[in-house]
C-alpha cells in the first residue's frame, strides 16, 4: 500500500513524468509502465492513483492548465493598467514552466489528439476561451469590443503558432523573441497601422 501522505507527491511525480515521456516521444502512444518507470514508481502504483492511462493523460493536461491559470492570476494581480495586463498574459504563456521543450511537445501532442478525444478537445477549448477572454478584458479598455475580439483572436493564434513552430525546431525555445513578436502584433493592431510592412 502507498505510504500515508505520499499520494500528492507521487501523483505530481507521475504527472511530471507523463509530460517528459509524452514530450520525448512526441506522441500519446505511451504506456503507464513507461511513465511509471520515468517517475521511478511501479506501474501498479500509477494505476492505483489514476486508474489508467487516459485518466493520467487528462490529469496531466489539467495540471498544465491549472499551473497556467495560477501563474496568470498571480501576474495579473501585479498589473495596474491594460497594457501591463496584456504583457502579463503574454509573458505567462511563454514562461519557463510552459515554454520548455518537453512541455511544448506535450501541448502539440494534445492538440493532435484532440481530433480523437472529446475530453482533450474540451480542455483545449477551455484554455482557448480563457486566453481570449483575458485578452479581451484588457484590450477593450484600449479599443472597441469588436476590435478587441479580433486582436485577441489573432494574438491567441499567434501564441499557438509559436508553440507549433518551436515544437518543430531543433533549437531551444526563445521565449523573449516569442513575447516580442506577440507584443509587437498587438501594438501594431492597436495603433491602427497595417500588420504588414509596405
UniProtKB/Swiss-Prot annotation:
PANTHER family with a match to the protein in the record: HTH-TYPE TRANSCRIPTIONAL REGULATOR BETI, HTH-TYPE TRANSCRIPTIONAL REGULATOR RUTR
Chain segments annotated as coiled-coil in the UniProt record: none
Protein function: Repressor involved in the biosynthesis of the osmoprotectant glycine betaine. It represses transcription of the choline transporter BetT and the genes of BetAB involved in the synthesis of glycine betaine.
Domain HTH tetR-type intervals: 8-68
Protein name (record): HTH-type transcriptional regulator BetI
Species annotation: Brucella suis biovar 1 (strain 1330)
GO molecular function: DNA-binding transcription factor activity; transcription cis-regulatory region binding
Pfam families in the record: TetR_C_6, TetR_N
InterPro entries in UniProt: BetI_C, DNA-bd_HTH_TetR-type_CS, Homeodomain-like_sf, HTH-type_TetR-like_transc_reg, HTH_TetR, Tet_transcr_reg_TetR-rel_C_sf, Tscrpt_rep_BetI
HAMAP family xrefs: HTH_type_BetI
Record pathway: Amine and polyamine biosynthesis; betaine biosynthesis via choline pathway [regulation]
Keywords, comma-separated and alphabetical: DNA-binding, Repressor, Transcription, Transcription regulation
Amino acid at each position: 500500500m502507498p505510504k500515508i501522505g505520499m499520494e500528492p507527491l507521487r501523483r505530481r511525480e507521475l504527472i511530471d513524468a507523463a509530460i517528459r515521456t509524452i514530450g520525448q516521444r512526441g506522441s500519446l502512444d505511451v504506456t503507464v509502465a513507461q511513465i511509471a518507470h520515468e517517475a521511478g514508481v511501479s506501474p501498479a502504483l500509477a494505476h492505483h492513483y489514476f486508474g489508467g492511462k487516459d485518466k493520467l493523460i487528462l490529469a496531466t493536461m489539467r495540471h498544465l492548465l491549472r499551473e497556467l491559470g495560477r501563474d496568470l492570476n498571480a501576474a495579473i494581480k501585479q498589473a495596474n493598467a491594460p497594457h501591463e495586463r496584456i504583457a502579463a498574459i503574454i509573458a505567462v504563456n511563454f514562461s519557463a514552466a510552459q515554454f520548455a521543450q518537453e512541455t511544448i511537445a506535450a501541448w502539440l501532442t494534445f492538440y493532435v489528439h484532440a481530433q480523437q478525444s472529446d475530453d482533450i478537445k474540451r480542455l483545449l477549448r477551455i484554455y482557448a476561451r480563457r486566453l481570449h477572454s483575458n485578452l479581451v478584458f484588457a484590450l477593450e479598455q484600449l479599443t472597441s469590443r469588436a476590435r478587441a475580439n479580433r486582436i485577441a483572436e489573432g494574438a491567441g493564434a499567434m501564441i499557438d503558432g509559436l508553440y507549433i513552430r518551436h515544437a518543430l525546431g531543433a533549437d531551444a525555445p526563445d521565449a523573449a523573441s516569442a513575447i516580442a513578436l506577440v507584443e509587437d502584433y498587438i501594438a501594431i493592431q492597436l495603433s491602427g497601422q497595417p500588420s504588414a510592412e509596405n
